[in-house]
């Protein structure tokens, strides 16, 4: 069975969908969820789903090789950033080339980069008068949201859409597409 490790900073709704999806199809298991946020909803979700969850801080991630060594011991087939807000250190990217994927709530390269996450993205998209938005699943590199694009899917922005309504549309895409694309990557 293939092994996934997830990183998440927030609510964990995408992480939960991934765990549930792979429990049903048994191609892979989520061996561990890592979070940098002691108040993240993903902690409660991991507990409820009986998936090991570990909290780490900036020192563990950037100043020591603690997280890198943990990942090397676990030997995941894929590392999935599911709402993880920190930039991944270059030593981890170098050790796991084309094995770290992220999901972003816009059609990159638009509305990507530092500070562009969650509702910030949807507010910027609506403020700019865009007619469509969507999701991008991509490999990560040393720059925010600039890695090779694996998959994109669009949603139409209709007159009167608010950032909150756009967020709902984008979440629906994320929940459906992210596990399927992860599955395809594991099978390739």
Label for each model-derived stretch:
Residues 1-188:
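One-carbon transfer enzymes
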């Amino acid at each position: 069975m293939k092994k996934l490790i997830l990183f998440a900073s927030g609510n964990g709704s995408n992480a939960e969908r991934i765990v549930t999806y792979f429990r049903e199809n048994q191609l892979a298991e989520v061996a561990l969820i890592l979070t940098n946020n002691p108040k993240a909803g993903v902690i409660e979700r991991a507990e409820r789903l009986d998936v090991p969850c570990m909290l780490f801080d900036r020192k563990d991630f950037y100043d020591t090789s603690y997280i890198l060594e943990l990942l090397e011991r676990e030997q995941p087939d894929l590392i999935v950033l599911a709402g993880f807000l920190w930039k991944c250190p270059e030593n981890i990217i170098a050790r796991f080339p084309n094995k770290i994927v992220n999901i972003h709530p816009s059609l990159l390269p638009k509305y990507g980069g530092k500070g562009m996450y969650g509702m910030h993205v949807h507010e910027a998209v609506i403020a700019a008068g865009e007619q469509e938005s969507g999701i991008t699943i991509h490999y990560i590199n040393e720059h925010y949201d600039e890695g090779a694009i694996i998959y994109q899917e669009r949603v139409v922005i209709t007159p009167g859409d608010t950032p909150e309504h756009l967020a709902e549309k984008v979440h629906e895409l994320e929940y459906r597409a992210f596990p399927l694309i992860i599955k395809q990557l594991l099978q390739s």
